[in-house]
Amino acid sequence: FAKRFTWWPQVFLGLAFNWGALLAWTAHTGALGWPAVVLYVGGIAWTLFYDTIYAHQDADEIALIGVKSTARLFGDDSRNWLRRFLAATVLLIGLAVIGAAIDRSVLAMVVALGGPWAMGWHLAWQLRHFDAKDSPGLVRLFRSNRDAGLIPVLFFAVAWFL
């Protein structure tokens, strides 16, 4: 619906998809903490990254019917915007990890921080293979974000037991 009135519908998607970070933190701790808010914003940055890639698949077709998206807004500058979203994602998720794991051991903190770091490498791989005119490639990159999300979860799970 947002793509009918804004060039940034991916922000609305991010707001909806990532609210679980706020909910889970509050359910677990009994209060909303700043690491959850930072994780939420980092999740929105990640949504902007992967859904801009996805939106490039049909950017030419949706232009014909007047639908808006970040892919159309950024156009030939999409790679630079994706780079910014990648950096914001990794930095914000890393900051959230620091806030959430500050009372854990140094080893647990280092392992947990490996999650956003490794996720960043995966997003960089996507960026390196990004071609706005290659629809099958765009689908492959978009779908690889399932793995991008699992990477930090695996690191966090290991850190939890340290």
Each language-model region and where it sits:
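Multi-pass alpha-helical membrane architecture of UbiA-family
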Residues: 1-162
